Amino acid sequence: SGTSIGANIREAFYAHGKADFIAKLQIALKECYETEYWIELLTESGYCGDEKVLNKCVELKKILISSLNTAKKNQ
């Protein structure tokens, strides 16, 4: 799910119109939520003690939400 975020963002840049762009960003956001879940599991189980990874995922999620809101307003 982590690598899918970047792949879907890249696809959004080459979307076939605004609706396709929004759809790709929505998929990226869903993948970001899934990645956040896995990072939380790794953190809680002790496999990943670095909060920076989770913080970066949360920050990326905020960027995607903001980008989606802007794209929907300009649709």
Predicted features along the sequence, with ranges:
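Short, C-terminally biased terminal segments at protein or domain edges
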Residues: 1-7, 11-75
